[in-house]
Amino acid sequence: DFDPEEIKRKVSVCTAVAPFAWGSTKINLIDTPGLFDFAGEAAQGVRAAESLLIAVSGKSGVDVGTEKAYKMAKDLSKATLFFVSKLDVEHSDFYKVFEELKSTFGPSVCPIVVPYVEDQQVKCYINLIDMKAYTYDDKGEAHEVDMPDFGHRLDGLTAAVSEAVAETDESLFEKYFSGAGN
């Protein structure tokens, strides 16, 4: 957010585009307002996008804005990702918000990267697809670290990924429940 009004409010009030390249692909991020006071601005950005990333506070979780953004995405047949933000804020809880997302939006919500939290501090992030842990430096560069002991929680998270994939396709569903997807 760079507009003086946005800086004052600490939220986006206008749609903005931030282009960048990833390999040979140009990606345009379209930042839309999250507050429903600016729903018209958000709708413009959603219509122009191929997919949506909906930011959800790690402290307050799913709210009316989250539900309306998701409905807008589904009504327009947009692929949707959720990003749990504000994990550095006191009383934030990624896992509580993840469960809330699943109960609100269904079993297709699955974790891809999850935080490893110790003493209310994020120590690293675990990519559940490649089963590796990473930290990030001040420049945003990833550094692989040893996988922390996640106990039984890791099994539940990887099962959630498999279940979500199985929910999207009949053949994957059959493969998962035959035991071949574990």
Write out the residue ranges for each language-model feature.
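P-loop NTPase switch module centered on the Walker A-proximal segment
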Residues: D1-A43, R47-V56, S60-V62, P111, ...
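P-loop NTPase catalytic nucleotide-binding module
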Residues: S57-N182
